[in-house]
Amino acid sequence: MGRSISVSFGLLVVFLSLSGTGADQDCLPGWSSHEGHCYKVFNLDKTWEDAEKFCTEQANSRHLVSIDSKKEANFVAELVSQNIKETRRTDFVWIGLRAEDKRQHCSSEWSDGSSINYQNWIEAESKKCLGLEKQTRYRKWVNLNCGQPYRFTCEI
């Protein structure tokens, strides 16, 4: 009887320690959860378009990360900082935003179709695609050449 109580108590402790950590989210192994979404940093060098295609091919509803708040921006910055593998191409990480018209104005939505509710620009010039910059600890958005291969983060 005493052993049964000990095992039950041990399971209760494990359950309580996991609640609130994101472990209760339905994220795949290797993905991190934050406020109902799952994120993963990929240490693959791809152009913006190839990175977006890679994300969508992983499963339905996956796209390059869209950042909707300062809280989410901070979460993504920490996730990238902790998971990026250092190479000469890690100065930038793609996010799901790019210019969609000939005047190079940004689209009014992220690559996943959600509206742009939060902005965190560091530069005004336009090179069509946006990413996070290591020099800002991945906290500011910078304009980048879409054809350059960089690491990226997918979100579902």
Swiss-Prot record:
Keyword entries, A-Z: Disulfide bond, Hemostasis impairing toxin, Secreted, Signal, Toxin
GO cellular component: extracellular region
C-type lectin domain mapped to chain residues: 34-155
Pfam family, one: Lectin_C
Gene Ontology MF terms: toxin activity
Main localization, broad class: secreted
Tissue: Expressed by the venom gland.
Subcellular location: Secreted
Coiled coil start-end: none
S-S bonds: 27-38, 55-154, 129-146
SUPFAM superfamilies: C-type lectin-like
DNA-binding is among the record's keywords: no
InterPro entries given in the database record: C-type_lectin-like, C-type_lectin-like/link_sf, C-type_lectin/snaclec_domain, C-type_lectin_CS, CTDL_fold
Keyword Secreted recorded: yes
Signal peptide start and end residues: 1-23
Subunit structure: Heterodimer; disulfide-linked.
Note: Shows greater sequence similarity to the alpha than beta subunits compared to other heterodimer snaclecs.
Function: Interferes with one step of hemostasis (modulation of platelet aggregation, or coagulation cascade, for example).
Family: Belongs to the snaclec family.
Protein name, per record: Snaclec A3
